């Protein structure tokens, strides 16, 4: 789960990380009122969407008068903001964040993320913060510093100070940054985050450290422990199909291809998508129905897949361990009739009650293409869309 910048800064403040004063706004008048309350004389008008690259995309602007705030808020609110993370269609801006202007002298980058290879939290920092951090990582990776944190001790003061000094900070600024890093680590752990990123982390002309941006991702499996974070959820920023899928406990992510995939198990789902690509096709989605699929659940899965008008064929790939193949077959038959399926359907089933499931499909009278192996299934579904 993702949250907006202003919500992330609320969290950072709770953990003692310094951030500029700011007020969210949902209309132009609210934006002007927020600027009046903050007092100025310089404000930053920021689009709030769940994507990076807002500055380059024209979603972050400096205002030097209340008239500027009104003009910029009118331009940004409601725009389709296109960044390198939104895709060409962009995302509609439904809310703004009006923030005090900052005394920017030097911008740094810092983030915390779980590194699965080392099974530790990594703190990643750079002396080259700001809008072009992706380019820095690509062209000058030596400017990206990574330290791994011992889960038994957490981020200690000396390790935090080492990171601060390695990105060029010194004296009181390095001490402040080290303190911020430790507070970020506490925030990361206590909120069950999967990513905390500050870009940029600013050092002003007095050497003070302040977070000018905040990006958070949270482990959805841990949200039951954090109702206060769930309250930050903005459904307008999420894919409607993914929201609908979550109502039926379906794991769904829409992709850019034309072959719908319905699979049980995340590992098998990824292997299925890889196999489709191996044989020259492009998956239209990731869809895991899990181990407790019912006929209703499979029907809803078909409906969600087919809302994507780019889907030209569907591949159902089931391994019947906990899930019985006859239950999936019943669901497939019910779904085909319910949605009046008019695209080719390839079904591959292996495992519990496999023969019964195959017989049910064969006796259904529906034009279902059967396959015994993943390679055969992928070959047939790719051929069906060409």
From Swiss-Prot:
Substrate binds at residues 264, 321-323. Residues 9-244 form the ATP-grasp domain. HAMAP family: Succ_CoA_beta (MF_00558). Heterotetramer of two alpha and two beta subunits. Pfam families: ATP-grasp_2 (PF08442), Ligase_CoA (PF00549). Keywords: ATP-binding, Ligase, Magnesium, Metal-binding, Nucleotide-binding, Tricarboxylic acid cycle. Succinyl-CoA synthetase functions in the citric acid cycle (TCA), coupling the hydrolysis of succinyl-CoA to the synthesis of either ATP or GTP and thus represents the only step of substrate-level phosphorylation in the TCA. The beta subunit provides nucleotide specificity of the enzyme and binds the substrate succinate, while the binding sites for coenzyme A and phosphate are found in the alpha subunit. Its cofactor is Mg(2+). It catalyses: succinate + ATP + CoA = succinyl-CoA + ADP + phosphate; GTP + succinate + CoA = succinyl-CoA + GDP + phosphate. GO terms for molecular function: ATP binding; magnesium ion binding; succinate-CoA ligase (ADP-forming) activity; succinate-CoA ligase (GDP-forming) activity. GO terms for cellular component: cytosol; succinate-CoA ligase complex. Pathway: Carbohydrate metabolism; tricarboxylic acid cycle; succinate from succinyl-CoA (ligase route): step 1/1. Mg(2+) binds at residues 199, 213. NCBIfam families: PRK00696.1 (NF001913), sucCoAbeta (TIGR01016). This is Succinate--CoA ligase [ADP-forming] subunit beta. Belongs to the succinate/malate CoA ligase beta subunit family. ATP binds at residues 46, 53-55, 99, 102, 107. The keyword Protein transport does not apply. Binds 1 Mg(2+) ion per subunit. Its EC number is 6.2.1.5. Gene3D superfamilies: ATP-grasp fold, A domain, ATP-grasp fold, B domain, Succinyl-CoA synthetase domains. It is an enzyme of class 6 (ligase). GO terms for biological process: succinyl-CoA metabolic process; tricarboxylic acid cycle.
